[in-house]
From Swiss-Prot:
Organism from which the protein derives: Bos taurus (Bovine)
E.C. designation(s): 3.5.1.-, 3.2.1.143, 3.2.2.-
Biological role stated in the UniProt entry: ADP-ribosylhydrolase that preferentially hydrolyzes the scissile alpha-O-linkage attached to the anomeric C1'' position of ADP-ribose and acts on different substrates, such as proteins ADP-ribosylated on serine and threonine, free poly(ADP-ribose) and O-acetyl-ADP-D-ribose. Specifically acts as a serine mono-ADP-ribosylhydrolase by mediating the removal of mono-ADP-ribose attached to serine residues on proteins, thereby playing a key role in DNA damage response. Serine ADP-ribosylation of proteins constitutes the primary form of ADP-ribosylation of proteins in response to DNA damage.
Protein name: ADP-ribosylhydrolase ARH3
Keyword 4Fe-4S: no
Site residues by UniProt (Glutamate flap): 42
InterPro entries to which the protein is assigned, alphabetical: ADP-ribosylglycohydrolase (IPR050792), Ribosyl_crysJ1 (IPR005502), Ribosyl_crysJ1_sf (IPR036705)
């Protein structure tokens, strides 16, 4: 597959100008779809592509019928619950406010705890709910004997930061801070920054996958050169700049004519660690810009991205929600099938949040 696959305006399916309303709506809709459909397969080591295709095709109503074929909505997980809480905080404060965001995360968990939250983050939220909590970043710093978490929880929810802030500097700053509320390891918050940057670039409409990767690599090589990032990677016995090395691997995989799912998982991962899932989501987006002989040609690029990302197995809901956010930001709402969207729990509120973000944060641009 050519590394410089075309990413032209025509390929965006009418998404419009950079940071258009269609892109905002597509971003959050794509993220919701990835979470809801991906949750069906979460934690399976292997996922049969035929099963995923059957699952999404069952969302389609009979020809001429509106809406979804499902009688019960596909439920979202903690991925969407936290992504929505993040957006709601940004809208309420019209800026990043760490105290408000931490409070909303914790209250969302308290209100609806059965969404699949991990044990570690539950401990953080319980501390946030305590009246004795004076520093909202301290509970995350105390995790894992003071080393902090390097899971993908900061990355899975971060898309709203990319929608709210238009400069690379702000995207990096607030992606880091929003992630550090629960993930204090640089291997965790750097993953959130990478995901936020990928959504940011997708919102602009880039010219090629090669350029897309080059920009991400430039940012991550700089970010991962700081002393804390080097130390955290070394303590885990990893290579220096683990995200940068995986971005380079993505470029190599895209150059190959044929890559099996097993190879992708072996090289990039499909786990709950941020470095085993964020690069994978980016690869899914870039790979699926071109047709896949195993996926029906009637599927558009966003649909292809979602199906392919879920077929990799592992942490399917989170990898698919991240890939869906990137693809939705790039291709826009025009590539979100109505029947798929309406199959998801909370799809109407998600769309309202996207429109509100665009109205509030685009007014000064």
């Amino acid at each position: 597959m050519a590394a410089a696959a075309a990413m032209t305006a025509a390929g965006c399916g009418g998404a419009g100008a950079a940071r258009s309303l269609s892109r905002f709506r597509g971003c959050l809709a794509g993220a919701l779809l990835g979470d809801c459909v991906g949750a069906v397969y979460e934690a399976r080591d292997t996922v049969d592509l035929t099963s995923v295709l059957r699952q999404v095709q069952d969302l389609e109503p009979d020809p001429g019928s509106p809406g979804s074929a499902r009688t019960e909505a596909l439920c979202y997980t903690d991925d969407t619950a936290m992504a929505r809480a993040l957006v709601q905080s940004l809208l309420a404060k019209e800026a990043f406010d760490e105290v408000d965001m931490a409070h909303r995360f914790a209250q969302e968990y308290k209100k609806d705890p059965d969404r699949g939250y991990g044990a570690g983050v539950i401990t953080v939220f319980r501390k946030h709910l305590s009246p004795r909590c004076r520093d909202v970043f301290e509970p995350a710093r105390a995790q894992f004997n003071g080393k902090g978490s390097y899971g993908n929880g900061g990355a899975m929810r971060v898309a709203g930061i990319s929608l709210a802030y238009s400069s690379v500097q702000d995207v990096q700053k607030f992606a880091r801070l929003s992630a550090q509320l629960t993930h204090a390891s640089s291997l965790g918050y750097n993953g959130a920054i990478l995901q936020a940057l990928a959504v940011h670039l997708a919102l602009q409409g880039e010219s090629s996958s090669e350029h897309f990767l080059e920009q991400l690599l430039g940012h991550m090589e700089e970010l991962e050169s700081d002393a804390q990032s080097v130390l955290d990677a070394r303590e885990l016995g990893m290579e220096e700049r683990p995200y940068s090395s995986r971005l380079k691997k993505i470029g190599e995989l895209l150059e190959q004519d044929s890559v099996t799912r097993e190879e992708v998982v072996s090289e990039l991962g499909n786990g709950i660690a941020a470095f085993e899932s964020v690069p994978t989501a980016i690869y899914c987006f870039l790979r699926c810009m071109e047709p896949d002989p195993e996926i029906p040609s009637t599927f558009n690029s966003l649909q292809r991205t979602l199906v392919y990302s879920i077929s990799l197995g592992g942490d399917t809901d989170t990898i698919a929600t991240m890939a869906g956010a990137i693809a939705g930001a790039y291709y826009g709402m025009e590539q979100v099938p109505e029947s798929w969207q309406q199959s998801c729990e909370g799809y109407e509120e998600t769309d309202v949040l996207a429109q509100s973000l665009h109205r509030v944060f685009q007014k000064s641009l």
